[in-house]
Curated annotation (Swiss-Prot):
Phosphothreonine, modified sites: 578
GO cellular component: cellular bud; cellular bud neck; cellular bud tip; cytoplasm; plasma membrane
Tagged with keyword Membrane: yes
UniProt source species: Saccharomyces cerevisiae (strain ATCC 204508 / S288c)
Upper taxonomic lineage: Eukaryota, Fungi, Dikarya, Ascomycota, Saccharomycotina
Compartments in which it is found: Cytoplasm; Bud neck; Cell membrane
Positions with biased composition (Polar residues): 623-635, 826-840, 850-884, 904-915, 935-960
PH domain span: 90-221, 254-433
SMART domains hit by this protein: PH
Function: May play a role in cell wall integrity.
Ranges annotated as biased composition (Low complexity): 916-934, 1015-1026
Protein name listed in UniProt: Protein SKG3
GO biological process, one term: signal transduction
Residues modified to Phosphoserine: 10, 31, 580, 592, 701, 954
Membrane topology: Peripheral membrane protein
Length: 1026
């Protein structure tokens, strides 16, 4: 049978929503009020990056929620996603500086005019506003103009940018209309987000320059470190799902080949290549590494087809797709290393994006893991191929210096600022900055450092649910700011009236929501003039957004050929800037040096207000972790100033840490101290798990994943329930080894220590399950109405029986018996198949037809008596596929079990519902025994396929005969042994042909052989039919 890989299907993402109307507004889509209605907040954030123009008449669509795909994210990913969200919304620094857009994205000259900007570094994105426009709006006291100016920032993405400081070797030629002068630019950073564009950022003094430089370097370091940590948690949570993970993790000398798409530079198109990962060759030097060769086609034997070769790698990690719903589908890998385009040239330091192509029926995480592991082995990264390093104090580990929650940051800006005391820091490359930051962390880790960041900081729900930057984050200050701003109070650099202070901007932007914080709940409505503005609306300010062409940069994530930029700067940068206005701007700065002052920290708006305002900027109304239910239609966003602890839509960080009103200790729920994620509680039935993964001790190669899982789990404080779950898994050998589940709706009730989480549906993608399913299909031919071979036909014979016979037997079963522990047979891996249909005639006395039709009302049975022999009760728990009808009392049975078998009758009112018999008295004729066994094997081969609610014998009955046969190590193929009959011992060994029917409490003989398949018919002449 063809193997089907496990995993969820790729989600079909719908288009971003355009417009939705308020619940309180009964307007129709054609009404003007609907066209001007409140727009989707997430769509507004996306248009801030895409600069798209909205269409009022577009249909309403919703973004898919994560829990609609695969439920809660893996416990290993919860701390990492929390840290990634916190880093994306961390404000590293803000202030005023000059910017010059030198080259556009296509390499053509830009305006090349110095503009004064107010900038905020939030995560790895620098938001920019025109300082003159903000100042004019403040001084003119024009609220509408102020809102319009505040809601249209431009962004520079530093994620994959090349950042370099100008030094004494760099000369800038400033060409004016009259003359050309050479002038050295001090305190200038050169930023290139693509291979062709370029920006110059000039700061007013050395102090400001060092602070901005340190803040940018720290943001880039934290982003890369968290991507590596995400890769480690991704491997630990998804690696165990691969069926052949043991082979993937093995240290082999074989090459790995696959089709990939490669982007050799930001702004460059994706190129489809055939990648070949070659490990170290035995003929090479001892310290040599492997390589990754990219070919134009799969004819790799031709050397002329080689496009490029990666000869070394400094970092290799999976890129977090910015949203948890895309984790299982994203296959983008970033490689930082040295690439050779020609053998005659020296390798160049650069970054590559690699995206392995997905295969049909294979989930994305399967594809990316199969590429990551061989690539790490080739370049000896993160401890591979020996084993992934899980020690957070090791610089080579994927989890190096990972903050332990509730700490959410690696370092403060002041910690990196201390590195600028080195005189050579201005010449450092990106790798030098990273190495020096690692040294700072190593010193702190040696003293037990666990990270920084306010332990009581409350991250707003908007920050955690959406990668978009909220207006409140851009303007308002909160605890993530550095304790001391390096930007000294300065005046505006322009001739216009003084620039509004940050506190004034806060008050102006906060005034957009009319009395938003003065009431408990406030709903937003779009102003009347919103339809007159062309671009997307900002939900926080309720106005639209326009980007200025001089500031607009492409927001697509990319990377820069770092070697090219280093080569252009290495011998001294020579720039020619025509019509520069730098001198005029410097004159303005000198004249207004004492008029501008930044906002004191004690004037910042309270954090709760900032969190509430930022919540208006986000579309998502449910948690990205799937804890709350998704809504089919978006709801109007609301502000709740009080009782925020009762809000169901709190951010994931708030749900773990708790708000200030709760004073809750930070905990990570459901993060066990176990070595895998197999027995974690899953809330969605779509979550597919492989039961074979429960025995991770048999997979030696998973030790690396287990260590990563433990380290990541230690990032948060495990709760009591997780520890109890781990202890239960260790103490119960049946539950741990076989991954058993108990259906709560069944009649079998277990104690709390025997309960294990319900995994929902069976793993239909498991090859073993499919083989079992094929076996069940074969059995269905014997249970359909067409063949009429089901054991349920025996129910017709129940018309002859007395309905009250032995009814008192079941009434004697006490409640305490139902709560007794019932050990489970080691032959089953899922009790959900065994706990829904009631017992059979082998497990109890005769019942009436009503009792048989209500198997859920049957009582649990317990075995009492000596150990069975090798023949009697042969795995009766595995062969009770369907409830059996009682046989008529007082009528001769068609098939009498031959062979002397002395059995003790059942005691009335006892706790045992089965007959105890002495195995030493079992004596059989060899010919009759072989005949009975052969008939049973033929007729009941698949009798246990759909078995449910089957009685499980006690440990003393679990010993199986040596001649038991198994199919694929799953279910035994054996006969359904009839219940032992009460017969008088005959000295000559011949069986008795008559049954005493006067005592109705005596056990009845069950049919066996072909007679049980004969339909009951009163006119039948078949001597074997009853």
């Amino acid at each position: 049978m063809k193997r089907i890989f496990s995993g969820v299907k790729s989600p079909k993402l719908s288009a971003p929503p355009k417009v939705f109307k308020n619940d309180e507004s009964p307007s129709t889509p054609s009404s003007p009020k609907f066209d001007q209605g409140l727009r989707s907040l997430s769509a507004s954030a996306s248009r801030l990056f895409s600069n798209s123009i909205s269409t009022p008449g577009s249909p309403t669509l919703d973004l898919p929620q994560e829990h609609s795909i695969n439920g809660d994210i893996s416990p290993e990913l919860v701390p990492i996603v929390t840290l990634l969200s916190a880093q994306a919304h961390r404000r590293y620094h803000y202030g005023i500086f000059l910017i010059l857009h030198d080259l556009k994205t296509d390499g053509t000259p830009a305006a090349r005019q110095w503009e004064e900007c107010y900038g905020v570094l939030l995560g790895t994105q620098l938001a920019l506003w025109d300082a003159k426009e903000l100042s004019d709006s403040k001084n003119n006291k024009n609220t509408s103009t102020m809102k319009k100016a505040a809601s249209r920032p431009s962004f520079i993405n530093f994620t994959d940018a090349s950042v370099r400081s100008l030094d004494a070797n760099d000369q800038v030629i400033i060409a004016s209309e009259n003359e050309k002068t050479k002038k050295d630019l001090d305190n200038v950073l050169v930023v290139s987000t693509t291979l062709k564009n370029r920006y110059f950022l000039k700061f007013k003094n050395s102090k400001s320059f060092k602070t901005w430089n340190a803040a940018i370097r720290l943001s880039l370091f934290e982003f890369t470190a968290l991507q590596e940590a995400y890769t480690g948690s991704f491997l630990s949570s998804r690696g165990v799902k691969l069926g052949d993970i043991k082979v993937v993790m093995a240290d082999t000398k074989f090459t790995y080949e696959d089709w990939v798409s490669v982007r050799f530079g930001t702004g460059m198109p994706w190129k489809r290549c055939y990648a070949v990962i070659s490990p170290q060759s035995g003929k090479k030097k001892k310290n040599s590494k492997g390589s990754i060769c990219f070919y134009e086609n799969n004819k790799k034997t031709k050397k002329s087809n080689i496009m490029t070769t990666v000869v070394d790698a400094r970092a290799l990690y999976a890129v977090y797709p910015s949203s948890p719903i895309l984790i299982d589908t994203s296959t983008i890998i970033k490689l930082e290393g040295f690439v050779s385009f020609d053998k005659s040239e020296e390798p160049q330091e650069t970054n590559l994006f690699i995206m392995p192509e997905k295969h049909q029926g294979v989930p994305g995480y399967d594809t990316i893991i199969r590429f990551l592991i061989p690539a790490m082995n080739a370049f000896y990264l993160y401890g591979r191929p020996k084993g992934l390093i899980a020690n957070r104090t090791d610089p080579d580990s994927l989890l190096f210096a990972l903050p332990t929650l509730p700490h959410i940051y690696y370092l403060q800006v002041d910690d990196v600022l201390s590195l600028t005391k080195d005189k050579n820091y201005i010449h450092w490359s990106a790798a030098d900055w990273r190495n020096n930051i690692v040294q700072v962390l190593q010193k702190k880790l040696s003293k037990g450092y666990k990270g920084c960041g306010n332990k009581t900081v409350s991250v707003s729900s908007g920050m955690m649910k959406s990668p978009a930057i909220s207006s409140a984050e851009l303007f308002e200050g909160y605890d993530s700011l550095p304790e001391r701003q390096m930007e000294s109070p300065q005046k505006s650099k322009m001739k216009s009236p003084t620039l509004a202070s940050t506190d004034d901007i806060n008050s102006a932007s906060a005034s957009v929501n009319s009395h938003a914080t003065s009431v408990k709940q406030t709903e937003l409505f779009v102003t009347d003039n919103s339809s007159k503005i062309n671009d997307s609306v900002s939900a926080q300010s309720s106005v639209t957004t326009n980007f200025k062409d001089t500031f607009t940069t492409p927001m697509t994530s990319g990377m820069l050929n770092h070697e090219n930029s280093e080569r252009s700067f290495g011998s001294g940068l020579k720039l020619k800037i025509t019509d520069s206005n730098l001198e005029n701007m410097e004159d303005v700065e000198a004249k207004s040096a004492n008029e501008f002052s930044t906002t004191p920290e004690d004037k910042h708006i309270h954090l709760a207000n900032a969190a509430e305002l930022s919540a208006l900027y986000d579309k998502y109304s449910t948690s990205p972790f799937g804890k709350s239910e998704a809504n089919s239609s978006p709801k109007p966003q609301k502000l709740e100033v009080k009782d925020r602890s009762k809000n169901e839509n709190r951010s994931p960080y708030e749900r773990y840490v708790g708000t200030s009103a709760e004073s809750k200790t930070f905990e990570i729920g459901n993060v066990r101290e176990s070595k895998s994620t197999i027995n974690t509680s899953l809330s969605s039935p779509l979550r597919v798990e492989d039961s074979r993964r429960s025995k991770n001790e048999d997979l030696g190669s998973l030790k690396e994943f287990e260590e990563l899982s433990q380290k990541i789990s230690n990032m948060g404080m495990a709760n009591i329930s997780s520890e109890a779950l781990s202890d239960t898994a260790e103490n119960s050998s049946f539950v741990t080894d076989l991954n058993l589940n108990i259906n709560n709706s069944s009649s079998v009730n277990l104690n709390e220590e025997q309960r294990v989480p319900d995994f929902g549906e069976e793993n239909v993608f498991d090859p073993d399950y499919m083989e079992q399913n094929q076996m069940l299909e074969t059995e269905s031919r014997y249970t359909t109405d067409e063949f009429d071979f089901s054991d349920n036909q025996d129910a017709a014979s129940s018309n002859y029986s007395n309905g009250q016979t032995n009814r008192t037997v079941t009434e004697t079963l006490s409640a305490s018996d139902r709560n007794d522990k019932i050990p489970h047979s080691s032959l089953f891996t899922n009790l959900n198949q065994l706990t829904s249909n009631g017992g059979n005639y082998q497990d109890r006395e005769d019942f009436s037809g009503d009792q048989i039709n209500k198997p859920q009302q049957s009582q649990p049975l317990h075995v009492k008596g000596p150990q069975t022999s090798s023949f009697g009760y042969r795995n009766s728990s595995a062969n009770s596929s369907q409830p059996q009808a009682p046989y008529p009392v007082g009528r001769p049975l068609g098939k009498i079990r031959t062979g002397p078998l002395t059995v003790q009758p059942m005691q009335q009112g006892g706790n045992s519902s089965m007959y105890s018999f002495q195995s030493s008295q079992h004596r059989f004729h060899s010919s009759q025994q072989r005949q009975n066994q052969s008939l049973s094997f033929r007729n009941n081969t698949y009798g246990s396929g759909n078995n449910q609610n089957t009685f499980h014998p006690s440990p003393q009955l679990q010993q199986q005969p040596q001649n038991m046969r198994y199919l694929n190590n799953k279910l035994p193929i054996n006969d359904r042994s009839p219940i032992p009959q009460t017969q008088h011992h005959v000295p000559d060994g011949r069986p008795s042909l008559h049954i005493n029917t006067t005592n109705r409490t005596n056990p009845l003989t069950a049919q066996s052989g072909f007679s049980q398949f004969m339909p009951p018919n009163s006119t039948s002449t078949n001597p074997y039919s009853s």
